Amino acid sequence: MLFRSLVILDTQVPLGQRVEITSDDIDIERGSRSRLKVGGELARNDLLHLALMASENRAAHALGRTFPGGMTVFVDAMNAKARELGMMSTRFVDPTGLSSANVSTASDLVKLVRETHRHALIRQYSTAESHQVNVGGRSIAFRNTNRLVTNDTWDISLSKTGFINEAGRCLVMHAKIQGRPMVIVLLDSWGKLSRIGDANRIRKWLTSSAPPRAAQG
């Protein structure tokens, strides 16, 4: 969703505009769940907040569907932006990231993190601990999918998680470690908490005078 938010902000789509969740936003490819019910309305900035912070796929799809010109124009704009940033191994086919036909590389994602980090709103939304929205008279609270943003020992200024079976559990972050800005890209972690453990091990290795040896086996 980092890339989608970049395109939305670059094109200056009205963030205060109300967007209705429709049946078109239901994930039929993966069957992922959502607490955003069909018929509910949210401001576009709330959808952006939930997509960045909580990986809310229905929110991400609604953002693409209501982009000026529709979904096809949105995806085309994403691919054009990728080429502009020199992300030559990246290709998008949908705005949610749920399709395995969306492809990228670790080096391309470093370029993406550096570019999106320039946007204060993306930094703010992606690292928020929680966000509450009112939909149809009901208050719904969402939490960040990266538990490290609530860890006081980390200084994280941008974060995004992702998961599909083909890619595994992924995490990208822009963080400061001992005062040095770092971009961390973790792809295909095998367990729910392994990307968190991997991030902590990377930080330990960077801050240790005697880097730990790689695990055997």
What are these regions (language model features)?
Residues M1-S107, R114-A120:
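Active-site-adjacent loops and short helices of periplasmic peptidoglycan-processing enzymes
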Residues R44, G70-G217:
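Penicillin-recognizing serine hydrolase domain
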